[in-house]
Swiss-Prot record:
Name of the encoding gene: L1
Name the UniProt record assigns to this protein: Major capsid protein L1
InterPro entries xref list: Capsid_L1_Papillomavir, Capsid_L1_sf_Papillomavir, dsDNA_vir_gr_I_capsid
Organism expressing this protein natively: Human papillomavirus 35
Subunit structure: Self-assembles into homopentamers. The capsid has an icosahedral symmetry and consists of 72 capsomers, with each capsomer being a pentamer of L1. Interacts with the minor capsid protein L2; this interaction is necessary for viral genome encapsidation. Interacts with protein E2; this interaction enhances E2-dependent replication and transcription activation.
Gene Ontology CC annotation, any one: host cell nucleus
Region (Disordered): 479-502
Entry keywords, A to Z: Capsid protein, Disulfide bond, Host nucleus, Host-virus interaction, Late protein, T=7 icosahedral capsid protein, Viral attachment to host cell, Viral penetration into host cytoplasm, Virion, Virus endocytosis by host, Virus entry into host cell
Subcellular location: Virion; Host nucleus
Length: 502
Protein backbone atom coordinates (compact mmCIF):
# COMPACT_ATOMS: atom_id res chain seq x y z
CA UNK A 1 0.00 0.00 0.00
CA UNK A 2 1.36 3.41 -0.94
CA UNK A 3 1.09 6.37 1.46
CA UNK A 4 1.42 10.04 0.58
CA UNK A 5 4.12 11.95 2.47
CA UNK A 6 4.77 15.67 2.35
CA UNK A 7 7.99 16.81 0.78
CA UNK A 8 10.39 17.69 3.58
CA UNK A 9 12.92 19.36 1.29
CA UNK A 10 13.32 23.14 1.54
CA UNK A 11 11.73 25.03 -1.29
CA UNK A 12 13.70 28.09 -2.47
CA UNK A 13 11.79 30.83 -4.21
CA UNK A 14 13.52 33.11 -6.70
CA UNK A 15 14.39 36.53 -5.24
CA UNK A 16 12.19 39.46 -6.03
CA UNK A 17 13.75 41.85 -8.51
CA UNK A 18 15.01 45.01 -6.83
CA UNK A 19 15.68 48.25 -8.65
CA UNK A 20 19.38 48.98 -8.91
CA UNK A 21 20.93 52.31 -7.98
CA UNK A 22 23.07 53.52 -10.85
CA UNK A 23 25.73 56.18 -11.09
CA UNK A 24 24.86 59.63 -12.36
CA UNK A 25 27.39 59.14 -15.16
CA UNK A 26 24.97 56.71 -16.84
CA UNK A 27 22.25 59.30 -17.50
CA UNK A 28 24.07 62.65 -17.16
CA UNK A 29 26.01 63.98 -20.16
CA UNK A 30 28.76 66.46 -19.37
CA UNK A 31 29.51 69.42 -21.61
CA UNK A 32 32.70 71.41 -22.08
CA UNK A 33 31.17 74.52 -20.48
CA UNK A 34 32.61 75.54 -17.12
CA UNK A 35 31.78 78.38 -14.75
CA UNK A 36 33.49 79.90 -11.75
CA UNK A 37 31.50 80.96 -8.69
CA UNK A 38 32.82 82.43 -5.49
CA UNK A 39 31.47 83.97 -2.33
CA UNK A 40 32.45 87.20 -0.70
CA UNK A 41 34.56 87.29 2.44
CA UNK A 42 32.44 85.50 5.07
CA UNK A 43 32.99 86.82 8.61
CA UNK A 44 31.59 85.89 12.02
CA UNK A 45 32.36 87.41 15.45
CA UNK A 46 30.97 86.40 18.84
CA UNK A 47 31.67 85.07 22.31
CA UNK A 48 33.62 81.79 22.28
CA UNK A 49 31.86 80.14 25.25
CA UNK A 50 28.21 81.20 25.31
CA UNK A 51 25.71 83.61 23.80
CA UNK A 52 25.09 86.94 25.53
CA UNK A 53 21.43 87.88 25.91
CA UNK A 54 19.95 91.31 26.49
CA UNK A 55 18.86 92.08 30.03
CA UNK A 56 15.48 93.53 29.12
CA UNK A 57 14.55 90.76 26.68
CA UNK A 58 15.45 87.23 25.71
CA UNK A 59 17.02 88.28 22.42
CA UNK A 60 20.65 87.40 21.75
CA UNK A 61 22.91 90.45 21.73
CA UNK A 62 26.19 88.62 21.05
CA UNK A 63 26.02 85.15 19.44
CA UNK A 64 28.19 82.22 20.33
CA UNK A 65 31.02 81.92 17.80
CA UNK A 66 33.63 79.31 18.66
CA UNK A 67 36.44 77.63 16.78
CA UNK A 68 34.95 74.33 17.98
CA UNK A 69 31.71 74.75 16.01
CA UNK A 70 30.60 73.26 12.72
CA UNK A 71 30.25 75.72 9.87
CA UNK A 72 27.62 74.29 7.51
CA UNK A 73 27.33 76.43 4.38
CA UNK A 74 24.24 76.01 2.24
CA UNK A 75 25.35 77.22 -1.18
CA UNK A 76 22.45 78.19 -3.45
CA UNK A 77 23.07 77.98 -7.20
CA UNK A 78 21.11 79.50 -10.09
CA UNK A 79 18.76 77.31 -12.08
CA UNK A 80 20.68 76.39 -15.26
CA UNK A 81 17.41 75.87 -17.13
CA UNK A 82 16.70 79.59 -16.63
CA UNK A 83 20.28 80.63 -17.25
CA UNK A 84 21.15 83.02 -20.05
CA UNK A 85 23.62 81.21 -22.32
CA UNK A 86 25.15 82.94 -25.35
CA UNK A 87 24.55 79.79 -27.41
CA UNK A 88 21.71 77.40 -26.59
CA UNK A 89 22.26 75.00 -29.47
CA UNK A 90 24.03 72.45 -27.28
CA UNK A 91 20.79 71.14 -25.74
CA UNK A 92 17.10 70.70 -26.51
CA UNK A 93 14.82 72.34 -23.89
CA UNK A 94 11.90 70.15 -24.96
CA UNK A 95 13.58 66.83 -24.16
CA UNK A 96 16.53 67.73 -21.93
CA UNK A 97 17.23 69.46 -18.64
CA UNK A 98 20.40 71.11 -17.36
CA UNK A 99 22.14 70.51 -14.03
CA UNK A 100 25.35 71.66 -12.35
CA UNK A 101 28.25 69.37 -11.47
CA UNK A 102 30.83 70.46 -8.90
CA UNK A 103 34.29 69.75 -10.31
CA UNK A 104 36.49 72.00 -8.18
CA UNK A 105 36.36 73.56 -4.72
CA UNK A 106 38.66 75.59 -2.52
CA UNK A 107 37.80 76.56 1.05
CA UNK A 108 39.82 79.59 2.05
CA UNK A 109 40.58 80.35 5.68
CA UNK A 110 41.83 83.66 6.95
CA UNK A 111 43.25 84.68 10.33
CA UNK A 112 46.50 83.37 11.88
CA UNK A 113 47.03 79.94 13.36
CA UNK A 114 46.32 79.77 17.06
CA UNK A 115 45.19 77.53 19.89
CA UNK A 116 42.00 78.43 21.68
CA UNK A 117 41.48 77.29 25.24
CA UNK A 118 38.37 76.66 27.27
CA UNK A 119 37.64 75.85 30.85
CA UNK A 120 35.26 76.05 33.75
CA UNK A 121 35.51 78.20 36.88
CA UNK A 122 33.96 75.33 38.86
CA UNK A 123 35.19 72.14 37.18
CA UNK A 124 34.53 68.86 38.96
CA UNK A 125 38.18 67.99 39.53
CA UNK A 126 39.10 66.19 42.75
CA UNK A 127 42.65 64.79 42.69
CA UNK A 128 45.65 64.63 40.42
CA UNK A 129 45.78 60.91 39.65
CA UNK A 130 48.85 61.14 37.44
CA UNK A 131 51.38 62.33 40.05
CA UNK A 132 49.65 61.59 43.32
CA UNK A 133 52.00 62.25 46.26
CA UNK A 134 49.56 62.08 49.14
CA UNK A 135 46.87 59.91 50.58
CA UNK A 136 43.42 60.98 49.60
CA UNK A 137 41.15 61.88 52.45
CA UNK A 138 37.43 62.35 52.50
CA UNK A 139 36.22 64.85 49.94
CA UNK A 140 34.37 67.88 51.18
CA UNK A 141 31.03 69.23 50.09
CA UNK A 142 32.36 71.15 47.09
CA UNK A 143 35.79 70.41 45.59
CA UNK A 144 35.36 72.13 42.24
CA UNK A 145 38.27 74.17 40.92
CA UNK A 146 39.01 76.64 38.14
CA UNK A 147 40.63 74.60 35.35
CA UNK A 148 41.35 75.50 31.71
CA UNK A 149 42.64 73.38 28.84
CA UNK A 150 43.06 73.21 25.09
CA UNK A 151 40.99 70.83 23.02
CA UNK A 152 41.43 68.11 20.46
CA UNK A 153 42.65 69.36 17.07
CA UNK A 154 40.31 68.81 14.13
CA UNK A 155 40.29 69.85 10.49
CA UNK A 156 37.31 68.70 8.45
CA UNK A 157 35.68 69.46 5.11
CA UNK A 158 32.57 67.63 3.82
CA UNK A 159 31.05 68.22 0.37
CA UNK A 160 27.58 67.02 -0.69
CA UNK A 161 24.23 68.19 -2.03
CA UNK A 162 22.27 67.14 1.06
CA UNK A 163 22.86 68.11 4.71
CA UNK A 164 25.42 65.94 6.52
CA UNK A 165 24.44 63.57 9.31
CA UNK A 166 26.04 63.49 12.76
CA UNK A 167 25.94 61.01 15.60
CA UNK A 168 26.05 61.35 19.38
CA UNK A 169 25.11 59.41 22.49
CA UNK A 170 21.92 60.53 24.16
CA UNK A 171 19.51 59.47 26.86
CA UNK A 172 17.62 56.35 25.82
CA UNK A 173 14.21 55.02 26.73
CA UNK A 174 14.09 52.18 29.29
CA UNK A 175 11.69 49.29 29.11
CA UNK A 176 8.55 49.39 31.22
CA UNK A 177 9.92 46.79 33.61
CA UNK A 178 13.23 48.63 34.11
CA UNK A 179 12.32 52.16 35.08
CA UNK A 180 15.28 54.37 35.97
CA UNK A 181 15.18 55.67 39.52
CA UNK A 182 16.68 58.92 40.73
CA UNK A 183 20.46 58.67 40.87
CA UNK A 184 20.73 55.65 38.54
CA UNK A 185 22.54 55.62 35.22
CA UNK A 186 20.08 56.05 32.35
CA UNK A 187 20.28 53.84 29.24
CA UNK A 188 22.22 55.26 26.31
CA UNK A 189 21.15 55.46 22.69
CA UNK A 190 23.12 56.36 19.59
CA UNK A 191 21.21 59.17 17.89
CA UNK A 192 21.50 60.54 14.36
CA UNK A 193 20.76 64.20 13.71
CA UNK A 194 21.47 66.70 10.97
CA UNK A 195 24.68 68.67 11.41
CA UNK A 196 23.68 72.31 11.65
CA UNK A 197 25.70 75.48 11.65
CA UNK A 198 26.81 76.20 15.22
CA UNK A 199 26.78 72.63 16.52
CA UNK A 200 29.76 71.72 18.70
CA UNK A 201 32.36 69.23 17.51
CA UNK A 202 33.94 66.46 19.54
CA UNK A 203 36.44 68.23 21.80
CA UNK A 204 37.96 65.11 23.36
CA UNK A 205 35.23 64.40 25.93
CA UNK A 206 33.12 62.27 23.60
CA UNK A 207 30.21 62.82 21.23
CA UNK A 208 27.33 63.00 23.68
CA UNK A 209 24.47 65.11 24.95
CA UNK A 210 25.97 66.83 28.00
CA UNK A 211 22.68 68.56 28.79
CA UNK A 212 20.84 65.35 29.70
CA UNK A 213 23.74 63.08 30.67
CA UNK A 214 25.65 65.39 33.04
CA UNK A 215 23.36 66.93 35.63
CA UNK A 216 26.05 68.77 37.63
CA UNK A 217 27.13 71.01 34.69
CA UNK A 218 30.69 70.80 36.02
CA UNK A 219 32.25 67.75 34.36
CA UNK A 220 33.24 69.56 31.16
CA UNK A 221 34.13 73.19 30.24
CA UNK A 222 31.62 75.97 29.83
CA UNK A 223 31.23 75.89 26.06
CA UNK A 224 29.93 72.30 25.99
CA UNK A 225 28.40 71.72 29.44
CA UNK A 226 24.95 72.67 28.08
CA UNK A 227 25.44 71.55 24.49
CA UNK A 228 25.57 68.45 22.31
CA UNK A 229 28.91 67.48 20.82
CA UNK A 230 28.40 65.69 17.51
CA UNK A 231 30.66 63.57 15.35
CA UNK A 232 30.05 63.05 11.60
CA UNK A 233 28.46 59.67 10.94
CA UNK A 234 30.81 58.64 8.15
CA UNK A 235 29.45 55.08 8.09
CA UNK A 236 25.88 56.26 7.48
CA UNK A 237 26.79 58.90 4.91
CA UNK A 238 29.06 56.58 2.93
CA UNK A 239 26.37 53.87 2.82
CA UNK A 240 23.68 56.31 1.63
CA UNK A 241 22.29 54.70 -1.57
CA UNK A 242 22.37 57.69 -3.92
CA UNK A 243 25.55 59.30 -2.59
CA UNK A 244 24.03 62.76 -2.18
CA UNK A 245 25.20 63.41 1.39
CA UNK A 246 28.89 62.95 0.78
CA UNK A 247 30.75 63.46 -2.48
CA UNK A 248 34.11 63.38 -0.70
CA UNK A 249 35.58 64.53 2.60
CA UNK A 250 38.89 65.69 4.06
CA UNK A 251 39.71 64.92 7.67
CA UNK A 252 42.63 65.39 10.04
CA UNK A 253 42.39 64.77 13.79
CA UNK A 254 44.97 64.55 16.54
CA UNK A 255 44.93 64.57 20.33
CA UNK A 256 46.97 63.58 23.33
CA UNK A 257 46.27 63.58 27.06
CA UNK A 258 47.84 66.38 29.11
CA UNK A 259 46.60 65.77 32.70
CA UNK A 260 44.83 62.92 34.51
CA UNK A 261 42.26 63.65 37.21
CA UNK A 262 39.31 62.03 38.94
CA UNK A 263 35.92 63.42 39.83
CA UNK A 264 34.26 64.07 43.15
CA UNK A 265 30.94 62.53 44.04
CA UNK A 266 29.61 59.15 45.00
CA UNK A 267 30.69 56.36 42.67
CA UNK A 268 27.48 54.85 41.39
CA UNK A 269 29.00 51.47 40.54
CA UNK A 270 31.50 50.45 43.19
CA UNK A 271 34.62 48.47 42.43
CA UNK A 272 34.08 44.72 43.02
CA UNK A 273 35.77 43.50 46.22
CA UNK A 274 37.67 40.71 44.42
CA UNK A 275 39.65 43.23 42.35
CA UNK A 276 41.68 44.65 45.26
CA UNK A 277 42.84 43.96 48.82
CA UNK A 278 41.40 46.27 51.41
CA UNK A 279 43.73 48.70 53.11
CA UNK A 280 43.77 50.38 56.47
CA UNK A 281 42.04 53.53 55.30
CA UNK A 282 38.77 51.75 54.71
CA UNK A 283 37.65 53.94 51.81
CA UNK A 284 38.64 53.92 48.16
CA UNK A 285 39.38 57.09 46.23
CA UNK A 286 37.06 58.02 43.40
CA UNK A 287 37.52 55.82 40.34
CA UNK A 288 35.78 58.24 37.98
CA UNK A 289 38.94 59.07 36.06
CA UNK A 290 39.06 61.56 33.21
CA UNK A 291 41.82 63.25 31.20
CA UNK A 292 42.19 66.78 29.94
CA UNK A 293 42.70 66.64 26.16
CA UNK A 294 45.17 68.62 24.10
CA UNK A 295 45.53 69.07 20.37
CA UNK A 296 49.27 69.76 20.54
CA UNK A 297 51.07 72.07 18.11
CA UNK A 298 49.38 73.71 15.15
CA UNK A 299 51.46 74.21 12.03
CA UNK A 300 50.98 75.39 8.47
CA UNK A 301 52.56 72.15 7.20
CA UNK A 302 49.44 70.17 8.12
CA UNK A 303 46.69 72.35 6.65
CA UNK A 304 43.90 71.03 4.44
CA UNK A 305 42.46 74.46 3.65
CA UNK A 306 43.53 77.14 1.16
CA UNK A 307 44.16 74.39 -1.40
CA UNK A 308 42.21 73.45 -4.54
CA UNK A 309 40.56 70.04 -4.77
CA UNK A 310 39.29 68.52 -8.02
CA UNK A 311 36.43 66.04 -8.06
CA UNK A 312 36.99 63.40 -10.73
CA UNK A 313 35.19 60.48 -9.09
CA UNK A 314 32.99 60.72 -6.00
CA UNK A 315 32.87 57.97 -3.39
CA UNK A 316 29.16 57.31 -4.02
CA UNK A 317 26.82 57.05 -6.99
CA UNK A 318 26.40 60.82 -7.24
CA UNK A 319 29.47 62.08 -9.07
CA UNK A 320 29.15 65.70 -8.02
CA UNK A 321 25.68 66.52 -9.43
CA UNK A 322 24.08 69.37 -7.46
CA UNK A 323 20.44 68.32 -7.24
CA UNK A 324 17.94 71.09 -6.40
CA UNK A 325 20.65 73.62 -7.32
CA UNK A 326 22.30 73.56 -3.92
CA UNK A 327 25.52 72.40 -2.32
CA UNK A 328 26.45 71.83 1.32
CA UNK A 329 29.99 72.53 2.53
CA UNK A 330 30.70 71.53 6.15
CA UNK A 331 33.89 72.92 7.67
CA UNK A 332 35.66 72.47 11.02
CA UNK A 333 39.00 74.13 11.73
CA UNK A 334 40.26 74.28 15.32
CA UNK A 335 43.75 75.40 14.27
CA UNK A 336 42.49 79.00 14.08
CA UNK A 337 40.55 79.11 17.34
CA UNK A 338 42.34 82.00 19.04
CA UNK A 339 40.17 83.82 21.58
CA UNK A 340 40.85 87.56 21.56
CA UNK A 341 40.91 89.44 24.88
CA UNK A 342 39.37 92.91 24.72
CA UNK A 343 39.93 95.30 27.64
CA UNK A 344 37.88 98.45 28.24
CA UNK A 345 38.68 101.10 30.84
CA UNK A 346 35.88 102.13 33.17
CA UNK A 347 37.58 105.40 34.06
CA UNK A 348 40.66 107.03 32.54
CA UNK A 349 41.27 109.53 35.35
CA UNK A 350 43.06 107.16 37.74
CA UNK A 351 46.86 107.13 37.53
CA UNK A 352 47.23 104.05 39.74
CA UNK A 353 46.48 100.61 38.33
CA UNK A 354 43.45 98.96 39.86
CA UNK A 355 41.77 95.79 38.68
CA UNK A 356 38.32 97.27 39.11
CA UNK A 357 39.06 100.04 36.63
CA UNK A 358 39.08 97.64 33.68
CA UNK A 359 36.59 95.21 32.18
CA UNK A 360 37.71 92.14 30.26
CA UNK A 361 35.84 90.67 27.31
CA UNK A 362 36.36 87.65 25.08
CA UNK A 363 35.70 87.50 21.36
CA UNK A 364 36.40 85.01 18.58
CA UNK A 365 36.45 85.88 14.89
CA UNK A 366 36.31 83.63 11.83
CA UNK A 367 36.99 84.28 8.16
CA UNK A 368 36.00 82.08 5.21
CA UNK A 369 36.08 82.22 1.44
CA UNK A 370 34.38 79.65 -0.82
CA UNK A 371 35.39 79.18 -4.47
CA UNK A 372 33.91 76.63 -6.90
CA UNK A 373 34.24 75.37 -10.46
CA UNK A 374 30.95 74.08 -11.89
CA UNK A 375 30.49 72.06 -15.07
CA UNK A 376 27.29 72.31 -17.06
CA UNK A 377 25.59 68.95 -17.68
CA UNK A 378 22.44 67.84 -19.47
CA UNK A 379 19.98 65.01 -18.86
CA UNK A 380 17.91 63.45 -21.65
CA UNK A 381 14.43 62.88 -20.25
CA UNK A 382 13.51 59.38 -21.30
CA UNK A 383 10.79 57.42 -19.55
CA UNK A 384 13.31 55.29 -17.63
CA UNK A 385 15.34 58.30 -16.51
CA UNK A 386 12.28 60.20 -15.30
CA UNK A 387 11.02 57.14 -13.42
CA UNK A 388 14.39 56.71 -11.76
CA UNK A 389 14.65 60.38 -10.76
CA UNK A 390 11.08 60.33 -9.43
CA UNK A 391 11.89 57.35 -7.21
CA UNK A 392 15.05 59.10 -6.02
CA UNK A 393 13.60 62.56 -5.33
CA UNK A 394 10.20 63.61 -6.73
CA UNK A 395 10.86 67.28 -5.98
CA UNK A 396 13.49 67.38 -8.74
CA UNK A 397 10.84 66.83 -11.42
CA UNK A 398 8.60 69.39 -9.75
CA UNK A 399 11.39 71.96 -9.98
CA UNK A 400 11.68 71.11 -13.68
CA UNK A 401 7.95 71.91 -14.11
CA UNK A 402 6.89 68.37 -14.89
CA UNK A 403 3.37 67.39 -13.94
CA UNK A 404 -0.06 66.51 -15.20
CA UNK A 405 -1.74 69.20 -17.30
CA UNK A 406 -5.44 69.48 -16.37
CA UNK A 407 -7.90 69.23 -19.26
CA UNK A 408 -9.61 72.43 -20.43
CA UNK A 409 -12.64 73.30 -18.37
CA UNK A 410 -15.98 73.02 -20.20
CA UNK A 411 -18.11 74.60 -17.49
CA UNK A 412 -19.62 78.05 -17.74
CA UNK A 413 -17.66 80.63 -15.76
CA UNK A 414 -19.05 83.69 -13.98
CA UNK A 415 -17.83 87.20 -14.76
CA UNK A 416 -18.99 90.16 -12.69
CA UNK A 417 -19.23 93.64 -14.13
CA UNK A 418 -18.40 95.81 -11.14
CA UNK A 419 -15.41 93.98 -9.74
CA UNK A 420 -14.60 96.71 -7.18
CA UNK A 421 -18.11 96.95 -5.83
CA UNK A 422 -18.73 96.02 -2.22
CA UNK A 423 -21.98 94.37 -3.24
CA UNK A 424 -20.23 91.39 -4.84
CA UNK A 425 -17.71 88.92 -3.58
CA UNK A 426 -14.01 89.71 -3.85
CA UNK A 427 -12.75 89.12 -7.38
CA UNK A 428 -9.04 89.34 -6.58
CA UNK A 429 -7.38 85.99 -7.25
CA UNK A 430 -5.54 84.45 -4.35
CA UNK A 431 -1.76 84.48 -4.56
CA UNK A 432 -0.13 81.13 -5.21
CA UNK A 433 1.21 79.48 -2.11
CA UNK A 434 5.02 79.53 -2.05
CA UNK A 435 6.82 76.23 -2.04
CA UNK A 436 7.83 75.09 1.41
CA UNK A 437 11.51 74.66 2.09
CA UNK A 438 12.05 71.10 3.41
CA UNK A 439 15.08 72.37 5.39
CA UNK A 440 13.43 75.41 6.95
CA UNK A 441 13.68 73.95 10.47
CA UNK A 442 17.47 73.65 10.30
CA UNK A 443 20.13 76.32 10.71
CA UNK A 444 22.69 76.80 7.94
CA UNK A 445 24.96 79.59 6.80
CA UNK A 446 23.22 80.70 3.61
CA UNK A 447 25.56 81.58 0.72
CA UNK A 448 23.77 82.86 -2.39
CA UNK A 449 25.78 82.40 -5.60
CA UNK A 450 22.91 82.96 -8.04
CA UNK A 451 24.56 86.11 -9.39
CA UNK A 452 28.20 85.12 -8.91
CA UNK A 453 28.73 82.83 -11.93
CA UNK A 454 31.33 83.79 -14.52
CA UNK A 455 32.61 82.03 -17.64
CA UNK A 456 35.91 83.97 -17.56
CA UNK A 457 37.86 81.39 -15.60
CA UNK A 458 41.19 83.14 -16.11
CA UNK A 459 39.97 86.12 -14.07
CA UNK A 460 39.91 84.15 -10.80
CA UNK A 461 42.66 82.31 -8.89
CA UNK A 462 40.80 78.99 -8.75
CA UNK A 463 39.83 79.34 -12.41
CA UNK A 464 43.47 79.78 -13.46
CA UNK A 465 44.45 76.72 -11.43
CA UNK A 466 41.69 74.74 -13.13
CA UNK A 467 42.80 75.81 -16.61
CA UNK A 468 46.36 74.79 -15.77
CA UNK A 469 45.56 71.32 -14.45
CA UNK A 470 42.98 70.63 -17.18
CA UNK A 471 45.30 71.70 -19.98
CA UNK A 472 42.88 74.32 -21.24
CA UNK A 473 43.59 77.82 -22.48
CA UNK A 474 41.57 80.92 -21.94
CA UNK A 475 40.05 82.53 -24.99
CA UNK A 476 41.97 85.72 -25.80
CA UNK A 477 40.03 88.94 -25.72
CA UNK A 478 42.23 90.72 -28.23
CA UNK A 479 44.45 89.71 -31.15
CA UNK A 480 48.20 89.92 -31.05
CA UNK A 481 50.03 90.73 -34.30
CA UNK A 482 51.62 93.42 -36.38
CA UNK A 483 50.24 96.84 -35.79
CA UNK A 484 48.21 98.18 -38.67
CA UNK A 485 49.64 101.09 -40.57
CA UNK A 486 47.96 104.44 -40.03
CA UNK A 487 45.60 105.61 -42.69
CA UNK A 488 47.30 107.95 -45.20
CA UNK A 489 45.75 111.34 -45.83
CA UNK A 490 45.41 112.47 -49.46
CA UNK A 491 46.85 115.86 -50.37
CA UNK A 492 45.60 118.04 -53.13
CA UNK A 493 48.09 118.28 -55.96
CA UNK A 494 48.89 121.82 -57.04
CA UNK A 495 49.18 121.65 -60.83
CA UNK A 496 49.27 124.63 -63.11
CA UNK A 497 47.18 124.77 -66.21
CA UNK A 498 48.84 125.48 -69.45
CA UNK A 499 47.58 128.30 -71.44
CA UNK A 500 46.57 127.32 -74.91
CA UNK A 501 47.09 129.88 -77.61
CA UNK A 502 44.23 130.33 -79.88
Amino acid sequence: MSLWRSNEATVYLPPVSVSKVVSTDEYVTRTNIYYHAGSSRLLAVGHPYYAIKKQDSNKIAVPKVSGLQYRVFRVKLPDPNKFGFPDTSFYDPASQRLVWACTGVEVGRGQPLGVGISGHPLLNKLDDTENSNKYVGNSGTDNRECISMDYKQTQLCLIGCRPPIGEHWGKGTPCNANQVKAGECPPLELLNTVLQDGDMVDTGFGAMDFTTLQANKSDVPLDICSSICKYPDYLKMVSEPYGDMLFFYLRREQMFVRHLFNRAGTVGETVPADLYIKGTTGTLPSTSYFPTPSGSMVTSDAQIFNKPYWLQRAQGHNNGICWSNQLFVTVVDTTRSTNMSVCSAVSSSDSTYKNDNFKEYLRHGEEYDLQFIFQLCKITLTADVMTYIHSMNPSILEDWNFGLTPPPSGTLEDTYRYVTSQAVTCQKPSAPKPKDDPLKNYTFWEVDLKEKFSADLDQFPLGRKFLLQAGLKARPNFRLGKRAAPASTSKKSSTKRRKVKS
